[in-house]
Each structure stands twice: as structure tokens, then as C-alpha cells.
């Protein structure tokens, strides 16, 4: 028995791994940007910071996955957008700290290496990197039979960005009277899917629920997470925002307070929130308490900004998209987030 045959008999297909690398090269090439060095396949990804026009660079990093949204991608056999979700979860976090994404690495673990499927996953990662302006400089694909079922895989990512030291957003600039502005989400994004899957466990995904305005359920559930880099970065460069909150798991209640100090609170007017149809459907079919929805989901707002009142008009001008004036920063009395 040769070593190759022995490894194959244990469930690891080395040739399939080589095929994946060959397939993804064209997708990785799309993400080339200033500072990226070296070719795909080295032991480490390289990035030349000296190419950047940053006087006092501070590196800011983030890592995340996409949770059980992956299980729906597997269920519906649609793998070409889940990679964008992974990138979004990482780069949206670091943009909230004031960082411009520089590069990204991905990690895929699977029970059986299927090159065509994994190419779709990486194509989605590459698309996310293009939207974020980040180079895809490395990654790992691990075939792990016995750990995962043959159709299963997991996906995680790691993003590194840079900020001018003076432009870091850490909550210290947010003050009473700041206006809370919201940018629309594209859908559920990548949080709350354990509940989503329970609510729609008996659905095929082909349903066109009346709340979903003619769209199939599976398409709405797998709508990729919006990447906010190109919207937020000009605001950061122009120093127009005091705080940024990426609305992920925990919804408004957990994430909004992360952008300001313990002595402040966010007062949000519920009727200003552009609640998406999918959240109305989840609340109805899942029989979820209305208040709890704001503790779980983004409800239609994926990024929230704290802005000085005199800068609001300029922020809206720079964004050139619908901007939702949601409320104000106030002195904290009891709760950190008050939804009226």
C-alpha cells in the first residue's frame, strides 16, 4: 500500500486539495491591492505597510465566522455567497474601530474536499474582499473526515486593517446630544440563525411568503451580509463620526452600547427603524416577542453611527444613500438602550 493510497483510504484526498488551489487562483487574483506581496501558496501571506500613506499606523484585527447560516447554505446547496458573509463579519467589525481593511485570510474545514463546491465558497470570499478593498493573501483548507460529515464544512476568517492613530474610533468621542444615524442592512446578515432555522425548520425554502414581497424564502435567508467599508471609510477619513456600532448578534441592545461610555445611553425611536420584511415574517411565524426581536436581530439597520449634530448634513451628503435618523445619545438613567 503506497502512502498516497493509505491517506486516501483514511478519507483525505490530496489531489482534490491541489485542484482546489488551482481553481481558486483566479478568484484570489481579483483581490490584488497595493501592499500585497508574494504569490498564493507560500507559508505566510505578506503585506508591505511601507506602501501605505499612513503617518502613525495602528493595526486593527478581527476574526469571525458565519455561524449556522452555513447549515442553510448546505441545505439549499448554495455556496457562492457565504464567503462574503465571512468577510463582512470581520471587516465590518474593524471598520467600526476606524480601520481600513488591508488583507484577509480564510479557513475552511470540511469532511470531504469537493473542489467545485469549495471554489464557490472562495469565490464568495474573494467577492467580499473586493467589496472591502482587502487582499486575500492566504488561507487554509482542512479535510477532516470523522470530524465533519461528508457534506459539511465550516468557514472562518481573519481581517487586518490599519487606522491613523488619531482617527481610531474607540467610543471616547461620543457625547450627549450626538445624533444616531443608521445604514440599512441587506437582510438578516449572519446572526440569529439558530432561531431562524427553528422558525423555518418545516419549510423547503421555495416558499414565497406574503411578507417577502415575491422573493423565495431561501433567497432571503441566504442574502449576503452587507459590507460597509466603502460607505464608512470616507466618513472616518473626514473625521465625521464619533462612534460606529456594527449590529450583529445581540441586536441593538447588545451592540449599540459598545460604541460609547458607561455614563451614556442610546435613545432610539422605533418608528424610525426601517424594519425589513424578513423580520416581520420571523416575528409572526416564530411567535417571537416584539421587544426580543431588537435583542436578537439587526431589524434593518446593519451599521449605526454617532455623529455631532452639526456634521449630520455632511455625513448624509458623503454617504449618498438613504440614511435613517434613529435617535440621540443621552445621559444614562437606567438602560443603555431605550427604544421608544
Swiss-Prot record:
Its main location: cytoplasm. GO terms for biological process: 'de novo' IMP biosynthetic process; adenine biosynthetic process. Its EC number is 6.3.3.1. It catalyses: 2-formamido-N(1)-(5-O-phospho-beta-D-ribosyl)acetamidine + ATP = 5-amino-1-(5-phospho-beta-D-ribosyl)imidazole + ADP + phosphate + H(+). It is found in: Cytoplasm. It comes from the Bacteria. This is Phosphoribosylformylglycinamidine cyclo-ligase.
Amino acid at each position: 500500500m503506497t502512502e498516497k493510497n493509505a491517506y486516501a483510504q483514511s478519507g483525505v484526498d490530496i489531489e482534490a486539495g491541489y485542484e482546489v488551489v488551482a481553481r481558486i487562483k483566479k478568484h484570489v487574483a481579483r483581490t490584488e491591492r497595493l501592499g500585497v506581496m508574494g504569490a498564493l501558496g507560500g507559508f505566510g501571506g505578506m503585506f508591505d505597510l511601507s506602501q501605505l500613506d499612513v503617518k502613525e499606523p495602528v493595526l486593527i484585527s478581527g476574526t469571525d465566522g458565519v455561524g449556522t447560516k452555513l447549515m442553510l447554505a448546505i441545505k439549499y446547496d448554495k455556496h457562492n455567497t457565504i464567503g462574503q458573509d465571512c468577510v463582512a463579519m470581520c471587516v465590518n467589525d474593524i471598520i467600526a474601530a476606524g480601520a481600513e481593511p488591508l488583507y484577509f485570510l480564510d479557513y475552511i474545514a470540511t469532511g470531504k474536499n469537493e473542489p467545485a463546491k469549495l471554489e464557490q465558497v472562495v469565490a464568495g470570499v474573494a467577492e467580499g474582499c473586493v467589496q472591502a478593498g482587502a487582499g486575500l493573501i492566504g488561507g487554509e483548507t482542512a479535510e477532516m473526515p470523522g470530524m465533519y460529515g461528508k457534506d459539511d464544512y465550516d468557514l472562518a476568517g481573519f481581517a487586518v486593517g490599519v487606522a491613523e492613530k488619531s482617527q481610531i474610533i474607540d467610543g471616547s468621542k461620543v457625547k450627549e446630544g450626538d445624533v444616531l444615524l443608521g445604514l440599512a442592512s441587506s437582510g438578516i446578515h449572519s446572526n440569529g440563525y439558530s432561531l431562524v432555522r427553528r422558525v423555518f425548520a418545516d419549510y423547503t425554502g421555495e416558499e414565497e411568503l406574503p411578507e417577502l414581497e415575491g422573493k423565495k424564502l431561501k433567497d432571503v435567508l441566504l442574502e449576503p451580509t452587507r459590507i460597509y467599508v466603502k460607505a464608512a471609510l470616507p466618513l472616518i477619513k473626514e473625521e465625521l463620526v464619533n462612534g460606529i456600532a456594527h449590529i450583529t448578534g445581540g441586536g441593538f441592545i447588545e451592540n449599540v452600547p459598545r460604541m460609547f461610555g458607561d455614563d451614556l445611553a442610546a435613545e432610539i425611536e422605533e418608528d424610525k427603524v426601517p424594519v425589513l420584511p424578513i423580520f416581520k415574517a420571523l416575528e409572526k411565524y416564530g411567535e417571537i416577542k416584539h421587544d426580543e426581536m431588537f435583542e436578537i436581530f439587526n431589524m434593518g439597520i446593519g451599521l449605526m453611527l454617532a455623529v455631532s449634530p452639526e456634521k449630520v448634513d455632511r455625513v448624509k451628503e458623503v454617504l449618498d444613500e438613504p440614511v435613517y435618523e434613529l435617535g440621540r445619545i443621552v445621559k444614562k438613567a437606567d438602560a443603555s438602550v431605550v427604544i421608544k
